Structures are given as structure tokens and as C-alpha cells.
């Protein structure tokens, strides 16, 4: 079960615990699968308008790949802080990217003083915050007047086969989960996303679309790629019996069938990239 907004049976604290545990479980594999998201990193950094000397916060940074990619853009004199709730993700980042700073933090309660960053980034993370309005308010609080945020989120489910094929397979073959979950596509409407930014007090909201191309030789390759990105879902799946996991791995071929191209599968997924500014005092 997924929800498009918090419902009475949704437990935000438990959701965070599940996501944290799931991402801790896949930290090393998530970093290794970074090539799948390289074009998204470039597009988000381009939209952010980084420059030398800026101080940058990367929220939901995971293994620090986006944060590390930002560092050359703010050099010389710049500083990048990678922040995440999952400590294993941060440990992976520290081991691979010693030149950036790290802070374990909940994006809905950031441990930073007001107005201390020139830019705040959040790549494919905002939809995992149970209270996205609170997370955006925290981004606005810690960014300087005249500063900017740049976030990316998955578009609507039909436009994201990289994720939706696996989720559809799970809905078809597994019983409904006992714990309500937020949909990773819940911020996939451009107008809604821009409206959220405006409602939080940001100015000049702008939303554009970026396409992500991915290819897989076999359903098994696709399924493993999904597991390497899936966070809380990966944690839940890891507790299933081996025969059920094998059924999912083979069964996803049904959902992938529309994307068969030659001897493999080619998927085009869409991501929304949104930017907005914190207005300077008049």
C-alpha cells in the first residue's frame, strides 16, 4: 500500500526507521550503482547554479556521490556538507569522499543555524520525507537570503518504469504490506511541486523534466538494479523467503515486456528538477 499523503494509519516515525534500515543495508551497493543516476546529478547541479566559494548542503546525500560532484564546482574556497539519516550511507561517503564534510541529520530537523548555506541540494530524496512541507521549510531556514535550493523527485508512476515495473510486480505477486508507505511518486506533478515551494515561502519556483535512460540485458539484471536503489523496500524484501524472491525476480519480466528492445530492455524514466530561491529582504 502506498499513500499520496499522510493518512491516519501512517506512522512517520516508523517509516523513517524502515527507510534508514533499508538504506543502511544497501549502502555499498547503492554507491556502486551510481552510474544509473549520473545524468541526473549533472542536471541537478547545473540547475543549482553553483559557483566558487559557495557553501553547499546536500540532503539525503546517501553515499555522497552528488556532494562529491558538487565540490569541484564550488572550488576554490567552497565547502560541501553531505547529510543523511542512514549512518552506513555516511560511512560509505566518508570512506570514498574525505574532502567533503558529513553530518548525520533528519531533514525535517536540521542541526544547522539559520542562513548558513548558499545552496541546498536534495537529489531524489524529498519524497522520502514524511512531511515534505516541513523538510522544505528547513531547507529555506538554512539557506541564505538570495540563496537557492535544487531538488529532484520522480515524476508520475507511468513515467518512471525504472521503479514502477518492480513496484507493479510486487503489487501483483505479494499481499498488501501491513505498514502503510508513502508513494515515491507523490510529488511527481510539476504544478503541485511548484505550489509546495511557493507555499513554503520560496520565490521563483521553476520545474523542468530530465530523462534518465537505462538498459538491462535480462529481468534479473533489472531486478538487482532495483534492489540496489530501493531503500526501505530492499529491507522488507530481504526478509522474504528465497523462493518468493526468485518468483519476483523472474516475474518482473511481465512488467518489463513493453520495454523489450532487441536482446534487452530499454527504459526511459522521467525526473522533475525543481529550483526556488529565498528572497532577499527588501
Regions found by a protein language model. Give the residues of each.
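Conserved Class I S-adenosyl-L-methionine
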Residues: 8-12, 17-19, 36-37, 63-65, ...
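Conserved class I S-adenosyl-L-methionine
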Residues: 2-54, 65-69, 89-92, 96, 148-175, ...
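Class I SAM-dependent methyltransferase SAM/SAH-binding core
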Residues: 55-110, 119, 134
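A short glycine-rich, Lys/Arg-flanked "PGG" loop and its adjoining helix->strand segment in the class I
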Residues: 133-148
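A short SAM/SAH-binding and catalytic strip from SAM-dependent methyltransferases
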Residues: 118-132, 155
